[in-house]
Amino acid sequence: MSIPAEQISSNWQTFQSYIEKYIKGDRKDQLLKFYNQHQEELVLMPASHKKAYHNAFPGGYIDHVNRVIECALQLHNVWGKMGADTTTYTVEELVFAAINHDLGKMGDGVEYAHIPSKDEWRKKNMGEMYQFNKKIAYMSPIFFFLHSSLEGI
């Protein structure tokens, strides 16, 4: 599967609109700065490496994150209607978590986590459109990269 360039662009605008609408103050400013700084990588990233998994195509990451945000907001509304205690978190925190839930897939700040596979056999027979980038450690210290980039939020 793939999505056209217009949809990738529209998905990016939707993604940014979630930040604008649900995130406030300095946290919003920091997120917009970070995501705009990494826009080129993020808009083309896949959400997963294998065709059988979700969104393993260019533009898949932001498409996936947008759907996670929408799902989180819908679940929040359903939980509220069912009488669940939704006062233990804010909608801002919920959206913040949804926005950033897969950020480690970005890589380590120097290298991408997933790179296009050059192995035609694995692509054809296993559906592995991307491979894990061996230049970065599995479960690399992305936290430290992100922490320094998202200081204070």
Regions picked out by a protein language model, each given a short descriptive name:
Residues I8, I19, I23, V43, ...:
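Extended aliphatic helical segments
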Residues H54-F57, D63, L75, A84-I153:
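Divalent metal-dependent catalytic cores for phosphoryl transfer on phosphate-bearing substrates
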Residues T14-Y18, C71, M139-F143:
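A general alpha-helix detector
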Residues F34-D85:
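A glycine-rich, hydrophobic loop/mini-helix early in the fold
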Residues M1-A47:
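Non-catalytic interface/linker regions that flank or bridge core catalytic/transmembrane domains
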